[in-house]
C-alpha cells in the first residue's frame, strides 16, 4: 500500500519516524511530509501568502520531507507533488498531545 504519513508535531518527532519504519517494515511504500517545527493547534489552516519551503530529510531509505507550512500544507504537497505516484492512504499522526 502507498501511504502518505503526516503529523503536526514536526519532522523530528520520534513517533513519526518509528511509525514510518514500522509501516515500511510491513512492506508498505511510505512517504513522510511533516512541518519543519511543531505546528499543533492550527486546525486546517493553509499557507496562502508566503512561499513554502521543502527540504529533503535523510531517513535511510524512507522518502521524508520537512515543510515550512502547516500540517494541511504538508498533506497537500505530499499528495500533489512529493509522493511518487498515487497514494492509497493518508495517516496523520502519531501525536504526542
Positions of predicted regions on the chain:
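Short glycine-rich anion-binding loops that position phosphate/pyrophosphate groups of nucleotides
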Residues: 9, 38, 70-71, 95-97
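Short beta-strand segments
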Residues: 33-34, 92-95
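A cross-family phosphate/adenosyl-ligand binding-site feature
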Residues: 3, 17-86
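Short, glycine-rich nucleotide/cofactor-binding loops
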Residues: 6-12
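Short, Asp-centered acidic motifs that coordinate Mg2+ and/or phosphate
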Residues: 89
Amino acid at each position: 500500500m502507498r501511504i502518505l504519513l503526516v503529523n503536526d508535531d514536526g519532522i523530528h518527532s520520534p513517533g513519526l519516524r518509528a511509525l514510518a519504519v514500522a509501516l515500511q517494515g510491513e512492506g508498505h511504500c511510505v512517504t513522510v511530509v511533516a512541518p519543519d517545527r511543531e505546528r499543533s493547534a492550527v486546525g486546517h489552516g493553509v499557507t496562502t501568502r508566503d512561499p513554502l519551503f521543502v527540504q529533503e530529510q535523510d531517513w535511510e531509505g524512507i522518502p521524508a520531507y520537512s515543510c515550512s507550512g502547516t500540517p494541511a500544507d504538508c498533506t497537500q504537497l505530499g499528495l500533489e507533488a512529493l509522493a511518487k505516484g498515487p497514494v492509497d492512504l493518508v495517516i496523520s499522526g502519531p501525536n504526542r498531545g
